[in-house]
């Protein structure tokens, strides 16, 4: 509900907006509702987390995309690097655990 109302306020000030990025899928889904309520079309909406609701929204043609994180890699690499640190080893400051762009082409596997 908050993302919807925040997006409504943004759309009043920016009626020609072309794209919205939600920090998570629930925010993106709220933005989609505000965009629909405003009667706007062709606004690119991208979320983050690849939730089943986002996948359904993508397949329905409402959300453009979402970004999936690799929870397996986050867990496995997190444990591995925690053990490395506990054993006095140095680890990289940043560790890429991987992401995947979810679009209509691959959204079915996230439903």
Regions found by a protein language model. Give the residues of each.
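A residue-level marker of the well-folded mature domains of exported/periplasmic proteins
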Residues: 1-111
């Amino acid at each position: 509900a908050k993302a919807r109302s925040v997006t409504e306020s943004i759309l009043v000030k920016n009626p020609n907006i072309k794209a919205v990025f939600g920090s998570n899928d629930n925010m993106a889904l709220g933005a989609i509702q505000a965009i629909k309520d405003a009667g706007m079309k062709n606004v690119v909406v991208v979320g983050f987390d690849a939730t089943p609701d986002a996948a359904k929204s993508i397949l329905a043609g409402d959300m453009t995309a979402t970004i999936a994180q690799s929870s397996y890699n986050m867990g496995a690499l997190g444990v591995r690097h925690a053990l490395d640190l506990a054993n006095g080893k140095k680890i990289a400051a940043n560790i890429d655990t991987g992401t995947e762009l979810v679009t209509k082409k691959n959204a079915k596997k996230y439903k």
